[in-house]
């Protein structure tokens, strides 16, 4: 079903797994209903990290993949970050409908890889979308072209986010953008942009609580952030970079982030080293496939 985290008020800290009470974490009998029950959302900034069960690959290479998270502001504004892979778009749609969503106020596409933007066409066909944000990096793939064609077909407002930008989600949630760096078009081997390190990095803040998301940033991208911002990127809740893999979530990044809660978007523990790194830093670790 997924993992839900809420910040209850301007003076409260974030609590995990749709906590029933302040700071209480539990696994109820009907976990799906609690994760997608929005009756307790009012007055909270809530993040739901969706579990997409679509299988990619075969045999030992088969993995459940796709990345998508929903943030709901205290006054009911909805922001979707990424849409999963192509077949996962229907799963994202179904889970949004289970929440009673009929409009996505803000849709952020962190970077143009298929497991993050592939489901966009299906989502866009099912919901009104107020604003789309992208990282501005073009990508040579069918899913990227389909995404851009759908944006044009529906005449959706679409803007590029870069470090230094900021916007609001409702009246009380501020979103600060830390990456990618303006004009960051450095090419890597083969002449292609490093799509993962071009991921949009941003922090949502509500009162004293903060939520971080930065797509599939590699350790190189994380180092650029820590060298530029240091402890200024610290956040209460972090979605682990690159699904919690050890290509990302380096020691310096985890230390700078110092989260209370870390969420991995994968069908298992992608890296025990990464999980233990967050735990050693004082975080509770959750995976959207099991928690």
Residues covered by each model-derived region:
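Active-site metal-binding motif and surrounding structural segment of the metallo-beta-lactamase
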Residues: 74-79, 86-137, 228-245, 258-263
